[in-house]
Amino acid sequence: MRKPVRIGVLGCASFAWRRMLPAMCDVAETEVVAVASRDPAKAERFAARFECEAVLGYQRLLERPDIDAVYVPLPPGMHAEWIGKALEADKHVLAEKPLTTTASDTARLVGLARRKNLLLRENYLFLHHGRHDVVRDLLQSGEIGELREFTAVFGIPPLPDTDIRYRTELGGGALLDIGVYPARAARHFLLGPLTVLGASSHEAQESGVDLSGSVLLQSEGGTVAHLGYGFVHHYRSAYELWGSRGRIVVDRAFTPPAEWQAVIRIERKGVVDELSLPAEDQVRKAVTAFARDIRAGTGVDDPAVAGDSGESMIQQAALVEAIGQARRCGST
């Protein structure tokens, strides 16, 4: 049996505690070796639960020879610096989305990973859930005719006042935290370059951080995409594809629980069919894929899942940046 990929973690984020590190400790392909924080108490808390070492400071973790790859759940505003340092230290990287806050930083890091022959992945977990490939197969087989319109939404209730996602200096805001999901889904189904026709957002009065937004995109073929996202909503995570002869609807699209049995609803000529799929743990699948690709010598331009490549990450960053520029022109 091959040795597991040895993982070091930069930062003690809630999502790492709840979802990613339990999966990394559970699958045979990875071993969590150490967790680094600038707060020793946080590092010790993580280390106690996940039976690994606590490290004070991110650089000290990167200097360790017993770590093959790092997982980066830091705030987005810190990603460019520490992903870059991890790659310079010859570590493979799995980073939470967004990879960085600018298209130029994303392109720079992808270029660095290419030169160092290292794996760099942006952690869009939903891409690892098989139902989205089923939906794309249905679309490409003509089940709903020609695609006319794509709609995707992701909204969550308000966060605690102290949540770092309300801090603009750390790359906070609804667009970079959850708006990126509908944008990535639009790219998954519409394919090719997307143009931002318009965007608007609602911002917090004091901090200026964006709390919600709407986006209108268009593909080269003329198909439009409507995206909605925000921190001030009843929970909703869904998308639909509206074609010339029918419609496909997917609920709990981006963050389904591992035990969730996905249902794809297909509407055609007044008839509704529901396609039930087995439950999948997209977190475990993402972790396993990352480790597998490291062992296989997969590079940044060899996708683990459709579209998950260096060039795709650059395209995603450029689209999100364009949305951000457009929303600032139309924000309230």
From Swiss-Prot:
Substrate binds at residues 19, 235, 255. GO terms for molecular function: nucleotide binding; oxidoreductase activity. Monomer. It comes from the Bacteria. It is an enzyme of class 1 (oxidoreductase). Its EC number is 1.1.1.384. SUPFAM superfamilies: Glyceraldehyde-3-phosphate dehydrogenase-like, C-terminal domain, NAD(P)-binding Rossmann-fold domains. Keywords: NADP, Oxidoreductase. This is dTDP-3,4-didehydro-2,6-dideoxy-alpha-D-glucose 3-reductase. The gene is spnN. Belongs to the Gfo/Idh/MocA family. Disulfide bonds: none annotated. It catalyses: dTDP-4-dehydro-2,6-dideoxy-alpha-D-glucose + NADP(+) = dTDP-3,4-didehydro-2,6-dideoxy-alpha-D-glucose + NADPH + H(+). Involved in the biosynthesis of forosamine ((4-dimethylamino)-2,3,4,6-tetradeoxy-alpha-D-threo-hexopyranose), a highly deoxygenated sugar component of several bioactive natural products such as the insecticidal spinosyns A and D. NADPH is the better reductant, however NADH can also be used. The keyword NADP applies. Disruption phenotype: Cells lacking this gene accumulate the pseudoaglycone (PSA) containing tri-O-methyl rhamnose, but lacking the dimethylamino sugar forosamine.
